[in-house]
């Protein structure tokens, strides 16, 4: 994946009329990161070879096409591809995503120190039974990122991937 390929694909979504049919988000999955910048509060940084203009420029270009920009991270120490995950950096990462103009976050569940989820997991803590409540109280990592995203003031659609 690269900035060029992502933006070419986005343009095709518009040119082929898919945007008019309801396609809105262009989501960049794993392997976009170059790690964290310790001199900038440990914020995530994009791979400058793949994304030479940076993520804010990618978002600006997608928004100019009338599309939303989706990013990827993981609730663990690493992403599934072995890049820097958000565990312990939720507030930093949420603020970074918001500053880039991200509209959607796919949040995976790799390298989470054994904090496996289950098919009934919900970060909202809205429950209908006591047994379900017991299941969701063991998974604060999703709620931590949800809170961090909400505190940015930018509306970011939050999508959970529960491996």
PLM feature segments, named:
Residues 5-115, 129-135:
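Aromatic-lined carbohydrate-binding/catalytic grooves of carbohydrate-active enzymes
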